[in-house]
Amino acid sequence: MESCDCFETHVNQDDLLVKYQYISDALIALAYFSIPLELIYFVQKSAFFPYKWVLMQFGAFIILCGATHFINLWMFFMHSKAVAIVMTIAKVSCAVVSCATALMLVHIIPDLLSVKNRELFLKKKADELDREMGLILTQEETGRHVRMLTHGIRRTLDRHTILRTTLVELGKTLCLEECALWMPSQSGLYLQLSHTLSHKIQVGSSVPINLPIINELFNSAQAMHIPHSCPLAKIGPPVGRYSPPEVVSVRVPLLHLSNFQGSDWSDLSGKGYAIMVLILPTDGARKWRDHELELVENVADQVAVALSHAAILEESMHARDQLMEQNFALDKARQEAEMAVHARNDFLAVMNHEMRTPMHAIISLSSLLLETELSPEQRVMIETILKSSNLVATLISDVLDLSRLEDGSLLLENEPFSLQAIFEEVISLIKPIASVKKLSTNLILSADLPTYAIGDEKRLMQTILNIMGNAVKFTKEGYISIIASIMKPESLQELPSPEFFPVLSDSHFYLCVQVKDTGCGIHTQDIPLLFTKFVQPRTGTQRNHSGGGLGLALCKRFVGLMGGYMWIESEGLEKGCTASFIIRLGICNGPSSSSGSMALHLAAKSQTRPWNW
């Protein structure tokens, strides 16, 4: 023992306290050694751990602490100096590591404590996401119900079926005790009960529209809670021993109901509202939730749109019925007009054959009788017969021509003719009649007037003769002159006529004919009457002349058919009158070698043409 470098213990090994300390050190060492093993195991199992180096340092600290307790087991017995040195090294190492760990924990512990805050934050976010998910699911459910209700509402376009379907579907979806719709009355002063779900109250009940609660509903687009005692909510069953159920009302815009016919619709033209009332069951267990109120608001909008579509459909059907009636009336009128046209044509055909043929015979015989020797009384009688026959023949011709103009069956003949010869022939026909009244006749043709033109020679001559005949008829003394010239392009543009649109071309020209007289004249305001059929203006002077009032009306139709325009000017009574017209004629550009043959053709034509004046 003297040569052994040992330390002797001063504790009584048989003491019970020493035994407890010995056992405690052994257990502490065992625990210290097991903790790092557990940490290493769980760190390896973890997918993510941000503080591995801290864990290694903490594990070293625990192992060294366990080593000190483990070495301390030998300190209870006699031990060598080496054991003491190992114990010292272990404690020094443990002290260094523990101090380093303590310093490191100063920075790590706040992060570890914030983990809890982050956990709470994440939990809060998770709760918010759950609420949002619940809201999304609720909105999807609301949308699904709205789509189902919309599909049920829009399956028909009958307004009563729409409202009935709405109440039934809302009652099923929301498990309602009662659901009703109040519509404005015709006067707009009351709301009338038009549709109910259970029919427990009579339809047709009314409440004044000026109630404060009704005005409040009209001014809000959202569903509103109303008291159970409100007149609108009297449709529900008796409450009894249960608490009053919750009642919600929402307005329904009447977008397009102005043309609805019926006692239960008012003429509001898109400015009124109906009110929908919804009542929950009377047991008081249910409350209105936000998504249910949103569902009610959406359904109210869909009902408004469906009613608008139904109104438009009814209006279109009503318009279609009216259009069918109008088409039927028009078809009937067309048939009657066709019958009238056929009757007129038949009449004209009969008149043309049965009246003009004997009239020509009378005119011919009267003319032959005037060439024989007659007494003055006989001559007056024959002249009267001839004059009346000519008048009747002229009226018949005018009526026939006017009828053909009106039905569009009269067509112009575009053939070359001698333009100057027409005016000379008119003068030769009018001059004997004018000489009887001692009237002078003048013919003035412009130097640039072409010799030949292309057009309807017969209608042009008929127009000039008609105007000249009127001039002779209404002129007692003085003169009658015809002026023919070509209208220049600048003169055509200066004509103040909204009815005449000249078209300039190298293939035609515009002929202007003026007939001036010194007759009785006419008031300016009476000039339009001259072109009215069967109308003769009556002025202050004596114009009691025979005629049917067709001549000038027929002339204006002929002029318009020839692409021209006709007008009359007069400065007043007893100041004469000037009748003017412009027509479009084609330019006749025949070769010079054939001018002789054209002249022969026109001469032969003038001898054989059947004039009916």
Curated annotation (Swiss-Prot):
SMART domains: GAF, HATPase_c, HisKA. This is Ethylene response sensor 1. GO terms for molecular function: ATP binding; ethylene binding; metal ion binding; phosphorelay sensor kinase activity; protein histidine kinase activity; protein serine/threonine kinase activity. Signal peptide: none annotated. It comes from Arabidopsis thaliana (Mouse-ear cress). InterPro entries: GAF (IPR003018), GAF-like_dom_sf (IPR029016), HATPase_C_sf (IPR036890), His_kinase_dom (IPR005467), HisK_dim/P_dom (IPR003661), HisK_dim/P_sf (IPR036097), Sig_transdc_His_kin-like_C (IPR004358). Belongs to the ethylene receptor family. Disruption phenotype: No visible phenotype in ethylene response; due to the redundancy with ETR1. Ers1 and etr1 double mutants display a constitutive ethylene-response phenotype. Expressed in etiolated seedlings, leaves, stems, roots, flowers, embryos, anthers, carpels and ovules. The modification Phosphohistidine is found at H353. Induction: By ethylene. Keywords: ATP-binding, Copper, Disulfide bond, Endoplasmic reticulum, Ethylene signaling pathway, Kinase, Membrane, Metal-binding, Nucleotide-binding, Phosphoprotein, Receptor, Serine/threonine-protein kinase, Transferase, Transmembrane, Transmembrane helix, Two-component regulatory system. Pfam families: ETR1_N (PF25487), GAF (PF01590), HATPase_c (PF02518), HisKA (PF00512).
